[in-house]
From Swiss-Prot:
Ranges occupied by LRR repeats: 23-44, 47-68, 70-91, 93-114, 116-137, 139-161, 162-183, 185-206, 208-229, 231-252, 254-275, 277-298, 300-321, 323-344, 346-367, 369-391, 392-413
Subcellular location as annotated: Cell junction, Hemidesmosome; Nucleus membrane; Basolateral cell membrane
Species of the source: Homo sapiens (Human)
Keyword Kinase on entry: no
Protein name, as recorded: Erbin
Length: 1412
């Protein structure tokens, strides 16, 4: 990394020849990605004078550095320093110190020993106060402390008499010390964006002041003593509430720039005309009704802006401003202009739009230098003929709709005045009907809205019409700015509040009820706490959210809407979010009366979201049901049931829909922030979003949810919490591990909170289905609390989840209760053997309810074999359980499950990557948890138990819960990085199995569960990058995880575990994975890949790691929001505390995704989604039959995306694509299936991890289609997490990943086997020469299959006699998998594009009828 360093050496020309040592005085190590100060620096400690270490990742300064006593300049901006060592006092010759953009909270007292220090730049650090010793730096001439947390300055600050520049912008200052009157040499003082209510009197003494900023404060008037600043040339007091400027200001004889914009002025002082040197006067955005006649005295003024006022006429004296170059008076009430303005001989730009002008004076023809004039939105009937003399005119705007700057004018005689005038077709002008509403800059800043807009701006790649409603408000700042400075004042305050809360929560989190509400400003924390308080509500919400999320998954457009709403209401997040969640839940479950108010809110919100985001119905075949999305929460239960099948089918189609540009956009947004919201269609999601909306962290988290289906929300909350060290999200796993443990030990209500959060997660993951019995629902609420207490180490959230599931499902799946095991304890399972208690977060994810209830439902499960198609575990658990719950409620759902299972049967032995399953199991396609492929892949109910060797012991046909337990044992078997994958998968399975297979070892789960929240993120980064690779969902998940991780930083890990079960699963991966963000995706991936178990195999929550296990498993220490990096400006920039970069400088490559996630992630998701969907669309080959099923449109796009992604992946990691370990099959299924976990995205995780990821079935499979995954994983971690892969992208990913895992042969006998009892599964390797030499038919939306018309599979129809496949394939062979990509339920065009894009070697898994 040091190759970039430059050595500036002062050399005597031939010194090297004379053998003399060179004298190194300057070293520049800027932008070298250094994590510590290079040791070679110390060899020059005697001569080194300047050291530049800008923009690295240095966390601490070694003591040796302070032996460089000749050092004059030390430049350390943009690093990860959290403290400035006291030994800095040794640098007695230090003159310039730059430590801006770090996480430094305070200066050491003995910095006073740096006597010659003249320049200190410490902006963008969370410095709350200056030490008294700081005022002893008597030689200080420049001090920059912008964007810190200063509330006051030392009383003896006036000792710094040599100060010339003092910048204190973006702090919380309310007053200045009186001793500052001694700073007579001060020339520049910047007090902008503070909290002053009046101009400090001490300013009167600063006689040397030349430039003074006091904008964006709370001033109400400008005192006359400002006039005593005779040297003042620049005065900016804009963006205040100034109602009056005293006349004394007129004595500032040297004033050149006076900025009074955005205040409440109704008049200007009459003496303003005496400011003879003013060149710029800005008085726009006030309430001026007239300009004083004395304004003509401003003879030097060149720019005068009085727009956005209430001026009705201009004084004739204004004609004396002969030097005027720019005049703006738009948005006033001018009816005419004084003819004197003709004397503005130097005017070049004249803005007069939006007035009431009916005529213009002839004298305007004398403005010979006029180049641009805007006259639109007036009442002009014509123009004076003298305009023909305006020879330099380049633009004359007469209408807002004008197509060209200059429109030809025609001569005409005015019928009234009989004068020659100019006119054209735009005259007479038509006044606007509606009043123009101007949004002033000083308008209060809405952090949630701003964040929403930022996210939207980050999703430009796939802008959809559905998203436009969310983007109505103009963006305030570019989303690409790393640290928007100055930060919006409200955001800054929010960060400060969060920091305070974090510190407070550190102490309170363990003891405090997670339900405790905070102030609105602490809404993020507040929300988390609220979650704790409103456990039952939260649970309800979760359910409804799960259902809704399923719907949203089905219709991404709706999902996206959800998110904006959630974001929009950060202030009321705690209550509103919960209420929304409960509302949604209620709608879905119909048995949660407790939260009726909330329900209503969330219903409306969701309805609004649904309206905003057009459902993807048109694209998906079964989408129509999905249309219900979040509009009818109360009908959700029924709707989801009926939708279950559709939803599952739609999952795939949704992905396809997502593929479409608009859909993609939705998906992308989902993957970003929207994606989370989408995942959480229901209010619960909103709750999570609200909680984290202010902190971008939520964005990532939600993405995880999308990808993993349930973890995302949890993750978001958890991360948020961990970051902020708040109780609010404790319910989920938000509390740090330690905190949670404390809560658990205390049997605190935190369980309730956890339950609440978990419920949310569950809902997000459609865990509602997990709840086995409606009867359990009321009971579960209580039970969850009880169980939480009982579990102790288990997560409080487990119970909550359980409640959620029960409530939501009124479920028939007792197994679902086992989901509580997600916490890592089967205790819960034991407690409620008959019902599955989904963990709030784990369960949601694990259940994969989003798939379809049928898949999860035990009855359906029966037929389902081991074909838990490669759904992402999250998806499986989420989609399957949740939707299943809904389906279960309907009862008929189970048949659907069977159907899905059947499809699964065909690909049964190919548990394949979840994505493959996705392709194969359309009915299961709905991924509540994952928005893309993973959802598509719903697992059948059949679940295979795997021994520690990853071998299925027996197929368990479980309604969904079974898959978890089976996998669980395997999982703990490989608790390493590989375990990440397997454990992730296992967790999912475990969640499902808890009930049926309480046998699963918690031990195995704990590792994977371990830092669940962290793992969610981590997985995305760490080994699970492989999982990420598995699918777009994984990518999304990884993204979210990554983002979460990024936001949370170290805290992320702790929070991760709080994520939903899937995420939790991810944690296992995480801990294996160093608990990197990749772990998130890893977990998700694992979850996805139930071993052959049902796609939706229910995974007993108990199988998940308990909180403690999760923690011990390697979860990174929970990070306080303020810990690590105390909310430096950069840290909190947009994300707020949760975004703390503190996570420790910059993450290693494995975890880089968390850090880089933002833009690159977005790009990736955007790119992949669009590409994948496009790939689908671009199946381009005739094989792709768009008609076949309504899916086709979306599928074709998805296929295109997949195709593109596959190409990328193959190009990047061709070697991985074909590798398919026998174990891999199972593994891929679990790993790949977790698209969310895969969210890590291929780039996030190194190929190695991809290649080996234990599946939940305990098998170790190569990472699903590592090449594809790798390409993303290997992309810089940043890129690695496509910020939020679109649903299509996820699907595509899944499909690609599925390819990675060889068919799951063991599950061979699963429901799929039912389809082809006499079939033999064969693995074939074909070398392209130059092509594959065979033709295929069939596929979803294909033209039909000549061999089995009722089968949507891909069949070989023709083999070239002498071609590469002539001796390997024969007509009638059904292709189950190719290079790890599942060909089950795949669209024809997609299959074609995949086969064509594969590199030379294509490894096929086919099913051949041995005896019919």
């Amino acid at each position: 990394m040091t190759t970039k360093r430059s050595l500036f050496v002062r050399l005597v020309p031939c010194r090297c020849l004379r053998g003399e040592e060179e004298t190194v005085t300057t070293l520049d190590y800027s932008h070298c990605s250094l994590e510590q100060v290079p040791k070679e620096i110390f060899t020059f400690e005697k001569t080194l004078e300047e050291l530049y270490l800008d923009a690295n990742q240095i966390e601490e300064l070694p003591k040796q550095l302070f032996n460089c006593q000749s050092l004059h300049k030390l430049s350390l901006p943009d690093n990860d320093l959290t403290t400035l060592p006291a030994s800095i006092a040794n640098l007695i010759n230090l003159r310039e110190l730059d430590v801006s953009k770090n996480g430094i909270q305070e200066f050491p007292e003995n910095i006073k020993n740096c006597k010659v220090l003249t320049i200190v730049e410490a902006s963008v650090n969370p410095i709350s106060k200056l030490p008294d010793g700081f005022s002893q730096l008597l030689n200080l001439t420049q001090l920059y402390l912008n964007d810190a947390f200063l509330e006051f300055l030392p009383a003896n600050f006036g000792r710094l008499t040599k100060l010339q520049i003092l910048e204190l912008r973006e702090n919380q200052l309310k007053m200045l010390p009186k001793t500052m009157n001694r700073l007579t040499q001060l020339e520049r003082l910047d007090l902008g964006s503070n909290e002053f209510t009046e101009v400090p009197e001490v300013l009167e003494q600063l006689s040397g002041l030349k430039e003074f900023w006091m904008d964006a404060n709370r001033l109400t008037f400008i005192p006359g003593f400002i006039g005593s600043l005779k040297q003042l040339t620049y005065l900016d007091v804009s963006k205040n509430n100034i109602e009056m400027v005293e006349e004394g200001i007129s004595t500032c004889e040297n004033l050149q720039d006076l900025l009074l914009s955005s205040n409440s002025l109704q008049q200007l002082p009459e003496t303003i005309g005496s400011l003879k040197n003013i060149t710029t006067l800005k008085i726009d955005e006030n309430q001026l009704m007239y300009l004083p006649d004395s304004i003509g005295g401003l003879i030097s003024v060149e720019e005068l802006d009085c727009s956005f006022n209430e001026v009705e006429a201009l004084p004739s004296s204004i004609g004396q401003l002969t030097n005027l170059r720019t005049f703006a008076a738009d948005h006033n009430y001018l009816q005419q202009l004084p003819p004197e303005i003709g004397s503005w001989k130097n005017i070049t730009v004249l803005f007069l739009h939006s007035n009431k002008l009916e005529t213009l004076p002839e004298e305007m023809g004398d403005m010979q230098k006029l180049k641009v004039i805007n006259l639109s939105d007036n009442r002009l009937k014509n123009l004076p003929f003298s305009f023909t003399k305006l020879q330099q005119l380049t633009a004359m705007w007469l209408s807002d709709n004008q197509s060209k700057p200059l429109i030809p004018l025609q001569k005409e005689t005015d019928s009234e005045t009989q004068k020659m005038v100019l006119t054209n077709y735009m005259f007479p002008q038509q006044p606007r009907t509606e009043d123009v509403m101007f949004i002033s800059d000083n308008e209060s800043f809405n952090p949630s809205l701003w964040e929403e807009q930022r996210k939207q701006r980050a999703q430009v790649a796939f802008e959809c019409d559905e998203d436009k409603d969310e983007r109505e408000a103009p963006p305030r700042e570019g989303n690409l700015k790393r640290y928007p400075t100055p930060y919006p004042d409200e955001l800054k305050n929010m960060v400060k509040t969060v920091q305070t809360i974090v510190h407070r929560l550190k102490d309170e989190e363990t003891n405090e009820d997670s339900g405790r509400d905070l102030k609105p400003h602490e809404d993020q924390q507040d929300i988390n706490k609220d979650v704790g308080v409103k456990t039952s509500e939260s649970t309800t919400t979760v359910k409804s959210k799960v259902d809704e999320r399923e719907k949203y998954m089905i219709g991404n457009s709706v999902q996206k809407i959800s998110e904006p709403e959630a974001e929009i209401s950060p202030g009321s997040l705690p209550v509103t979010a919960n209420m929304k969640a409960s509302e949604n839940l209620k709608h879905i479950v119909n048995h949660d009366d407790v939260f009726e108010e909330s329900e209503e809110l969330s219903s409306d919100e969701e309805m609004k979201m649904a309206e905003m985001r057009p459902p993807l119905i048109e694209t998906s075949i079964n989408q129509p049901k999905v249309v219900a999305l979040s509009n009818n929460k109360k009908d959700d239960t029924k709707e989801t049931d009926s939708l279950s099948d559709e939803v599952t089918h739609n999952s795939n189609q949704n992905n396809s829909n997502c593929s479409s540009p608009s859909r993609m956009s939705d998906s992308v947004s989902l993957n970003t922030d929207s994606s989370q919201d989408t995942s959480l269609c229901s209010p619960v999601k909103q709750t999570h979003i609200d909680i984290n909306s202010k902190i971008r962290q939520e964005d990532e988290n939600f993405n995880s949810l999308l990808q993993n289906g349930d973890i995302l929300n949890s993750s978001t909350e958890e991360k948020f919490k961990a970051h902020d060290k708040k109780d609010f999200n404790l319910p989920e796993y938000d509390l740090n591990v330690e905190e949670r443990l404390v809560l658990i030990e205390k049997s605190v209500d935190s369980t309730a909170t956890a339950d609440d959060t978990h419920k949310l997660d569950h809902i997000n993951m459609n865990l509602n289905k997990l709840i086995t019995n409606d009867t359990f629902q009321p009971e579960i609420m209580e039970r969850s609390k009880t169980q939480d207490i009982v579990l102790g180490t288990s997560f409080l959230s487990i119970n909550s989840k359980e409640e959620t599931e029960h409530l939501e499902n009124g479920n028939k799946y007792p197994n679902l209760e086992s989901v509580n095991k997600v916490n890592g304890h089967s205790e819960e399972t034991s407690q409620s053997p008959n019902r599955t208690e989904p963990h709030d977060s784990d369960c949601s994810v694990d259940l994969g309810i989003s798939k379809s209830t049928e898949d999860l439902s035990p009855q359906k499960s029966g037929p389902v074999g081991s074909v838990v198609k490669s759904h992402s575990i999250t998806n499986m658990e989420i989609g399957g359980l949740k939707i299943y719950d809904i389906l279960s409620d309907n009862g008929p759902q189970q048949p659907s499950t069977t159907v899905k299972i059947t499809s699964a049967v065909d690909g049964k032995n190919i548990v394949r990557s979840k994505s493959a399953t996705l392709l194969y199991d359309q009915p299961l396609q709905v991924f509540t948890g994952s928005s893309s492929s993973s959802d598509l892949i719903s697992g059948t109910k059949a679940i295979f138990k795997f021994d520690s060797n990853h071998n299925p012991e027996e197929p368990n046909i479980i309604r969904g819960p079974t898959s978890g337990p089976q996998s669980a044992p395997q999982i703990y078997g490989p608790p390493q990085y590989n375990i990440q994958y397997s454990s992730s998968a296992a967790v999912k399975d475990t969640l499902w199995h808890s009930k049926q297979n309480p046998q699963i070892d918690h031990a195995s789960f704990p590792p994977q569960l371990l830092p669940r929240s962290e793992s969610t993120e981590n997985q995305s980064y760490a080994k699970h990058s492989a999982n990420m690779n598995f699918s777009n969902h994984n990518n999304v998940r990884a993204n979210t995880a990554y983002h979460l991780h990024q936001r949370l930083g170290p805290a992320r890990h702790g929070e991760m575990w709080a994520i939903s079960p899937n995420d939790r699963l991810i944690p296992a991966v995480t801990r294996s994975t160093i608990q990197r963000q990749s772990s998130v995706s890893s977990t998700a991936s694992v979850n996805l890949g139930d071993p052959g178990s049902t796609r939706r195999a229910q995974i007993p929550e108990g199988d998940y790691l308990s909180y403690r296990e999760f923690h011990s498993a390697g979860r990174t220490p929970p990070m306080m929001p303020g810990s690590q990096r105390p909310l430096s400006a950069r840290t909190y920039s947009i994300d707020g505390p949760n975004a703390s970069r503190p996570q420790s400088a910059r993450p290693s490559i494995n975890e880089i995704p968390e850090r880089t996630m933002s833009v690159s992630d977005f790009n990736y998701s955007r790119t992949s989604p669009s590409k994948r969907p496009n790939a689908r669309v671009g199946s381009e080959h005739s094989l792709l039959d768009p008609p076949g099923k309504s899916k086709v449109p979306r599928d074709w796009r998805e296929q295109v995306l997949r195709h593109i992604e596959a190409k990328k992946l193959e190009k990047k990691h061709p070697q991985t694509s074909s590798s398919g370990d026998p174990c891999q099959d199972g593994i891929f299924i679990s790993g790949q299936q977790n698209y969310s976990s895969a969210t890590l995205s291929h780039k996030d995780v190194p190929p190695d991890s991809l290649m080996k990821m234990p599946l939940s079935n305990g098998q170790m499979g190569q990472p699903l289609r590592p090449q594809a995954n790798y390409s993303q994983i290997h992309h810089p971690p940043q890129a690695s997490v496509a910020r939020h892969p679109s649903r299509e992208q996820l699907i595509d990913y899944l499909m690609l990943k599925v390819a990675h895992q060889p068919p799951y042969t063991q599950p061979h006998c699963s429901p799929r086997q039912g389809h082809e009892l006499a079939k033999q599964e064969i693995r074939v390797r074909v070398e392209k020469d130059p092509e594959l030499g065979f033709s295929i038919s069939g596929g979803v939306g294909g033209r039909g299959n000549p061999f089995r018309p009722d089968d949507d599979g891909i069949f070989v129809t023709r083999v070239q006699p002498e071609g590469p496949a002539s001796k390997l394939l024969q007509p009638g062979d059904k292709i189950i998998q190719a290079n790890g990509y599942s060909f089950i339920n795949i669209e024809h065009g997609q299959a074609v594009s995949l086969l064509k894009t594969f590199q030379n070697t294509v490894e096929l898994i086919i099913v051949r009828e041995v005896s019919s």
